[in-house]
From Swiss-Prot:
Residues 51-119 bind DNA. This is Transcription factor SOX-1. It holds the Pfam family SOXp. GO terms for biological process: brain development; cellular response to leukemia inhibitory factor; chromatin organization; forebrain neuron development; interneuron migration; lens morphogenesis in camera-type eye; negative regulation of transcription by RNA polymerase II; neuron differentiation. The gene is SOX1. Transcriptional activator. May function as a switch in neuronal development. Keeps neural cells undifferentiated by counteracting the activity of proneural proteins and suppresses neuronal differentiation. Keywords: Activator, DNA-binding, Nucleus, Transcription, Transcription regulation. Residues 224-240 have a biased composition (Basic residues). It comes from Homo sapiens.
Amino acid sequence: MYSMMMETDLHSPGGAQAPTNLSGPAGAGGGGGGGGGGGGGGGAKANQDRVKRPMNAFMVWSRGQRRKMAQENPKMHNSEISKRLGAEWKVMSEAEKRPFIDEAKRLRALHMKEHPDYKYRPRRKTKTLLKKDKYSLAGGLLAAGAGGGGAAVAMGVGVGVGAAAVGQRLESPGGAAGGGYAHVNGWANGAYPGSVAAAAAAAAMMQEAQLAYGQHPGAGGAHPHAHPAHPHPHHPHAHPHNPQPMHRYDMGALQYSPISNSQGYMSASPSGYGGLPYGAAAAAAAAAGGAHQNSAVAAAAAAAAASSGALGALGSLVKSEPSGSPPAPAHSRAPCPGDLREMISMYLPAGEGGDPAAAAAAAAQSRLHSLPQHYQGAGAGVNGTVPLTHI
């Protein structure tokens, strides 16, 4: 049915219709809306020297029909009017289209007479660029810690620092001598601030992370100075998809300390995910929620972070464990908060099984005092990081 219109357009000096006045039903909104060739008053005022193309048969017919349909349906959108006009034009017979085809030929001949050297120059449509500010907030908050952990949070990786730490170790297994803990653990070189102001900022970020995210040891709570905006709630409910390999490597990174240097990555990995998080996570969650009197440990962690470059938080969450402890069989399901006390007593050593909360507090406090002294004495590494001299 478009054969006659296509003939009309092909024989015209300009070729096909303008982008807004396409031949056929798609162009019903272009030329008829403003009264044919005089439509688009703003564009005509801006481009007075621009010559418009002659209307085809459909444009001639739809000019009057569009006005009539708009008066009958004032709330109908112009695109819907165009669809209806196009469908109506398709079902019209050739005899009904004939007068409009003749009118289109007359208009084309008149246009050729008035503009003999006319050549159609299509206007390029400007493509709307998509705004790429999805991760502007995360990128702004993680500008200081621009290492692997920041990239992991920006990409939305569920396990956070664990994924970044695994990636760093897989990519550069021998890079620990040059970069220290910064490259082994996936943190940036500036993650251990040397100045007092940076230490105070790290302590404030740590406290904010404790209050907001409930001390997640695997992804958010262990490194609060590098991930203040990591959206993980509490550890038992945050990972129903069982991301065990990532956190095993992450716990290995946390156990890489002089307290447990006899246990390497291999001995820490089997017991890391099952044994380590629950002892530290339950104590930290109980301290944050006010379940017992361990709130002094959080204050001591903040003070140690301000004095020794935010290393107290690492010490409070490092929980050394015998290498023979099995992984947690109950981690395939999300335990209720009431089961935390049983889990603590299950994974604590035998001497500390009497009072799990007091035992966890004592263990965390002892590590708070031991770890910062070691790192203060050995803090002569590259860029303020700690050399791995105790391997």
